[in-house]
Amino acid sequence: MIAVFDLDGTVLDSSHRALINEQGGINIEEWRTHTREQILNDSELPLAQYMRDCIKNPSVRVWICTSRNLSRADYDLLDNLGIRGADLILSRDRNDNREDVPYKIAKIRGKLNLPSVRKRERVFFDDRADIRHAMARLGFVCPAPQFWGLYHSA
C-alpha cells in the first residue's frame, strides 16, 4: 500500500498561523513569512499516529504531499513529531504559486507510473474535498475526514 498524507489540517494543526484564501487554501505569500518559532508551535492531529504506524510498517510506503514550502524548521517539526521517516516528501518549490489542486496533481501524477507504484493500493489523506476529489480521479482511495477514525491506531 502507498499512504499519502497532506500535512496542514490532516496530520498537523497549523491553524494558529493559517490565513485562508478565497478557494479555502493557504495564502502562500503570507505562509512563507512564518518564523521557525511559529512553525515549531504546530501540533499533531490524531491521524499523525496512524502515519507513524504506516512509517513503521515495512509493507507500506509513506509519502507526504504538502503545499508547504518546507524549511529547516518544518523538517525539525517532522522529526520532533516522529513523522519524518516518509519514503517520499513532495513539497512546494519556493517559486511555485499554483493553486493547491493543480500543484498536487502535478506532484503526484508523475509518480503513478513507476513500477513500484503502479499496482499498489493507494490511499490519500487530505482535509480538502477538492483535493480528495482530484486524487480519487487518479485512482486513490480518499477517505473524508469523518472516516479517518477508522485508520487510527488502537
Describe the predicted segments one by one.
Residues M1-R98:
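Alpha-helical substrate-recognition element adjacent to the catalytic core
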Residues R17-N21, P115, R137-L138:
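Single-residue recognition of alpha-helix boundary sites
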Residues N41-E44, D96-D100, K107, N113, ...:
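A generic "structured core" feature
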Residues L47-N57, I105-V117:
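Short, basic/hydrophobic alpha-helical segments
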Residues Y75-I83, K111, H133-F140:
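Short, aromatic/basic amphipathic alpha-helical patches
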Residues R84-G85, R118-R120:
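Short loop/turn motifs at secondary-structure junctions
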Residues D93-V101, W148-A154:
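A short acidic, often aromatic-flanked loop/helix-cap motif at beta-alpha or helix-coil junctions
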Residues K119-A154:
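Acidic, Mg2+-coordinating phosphoryl-transfer loop and its flanking beta/alpha structural elements
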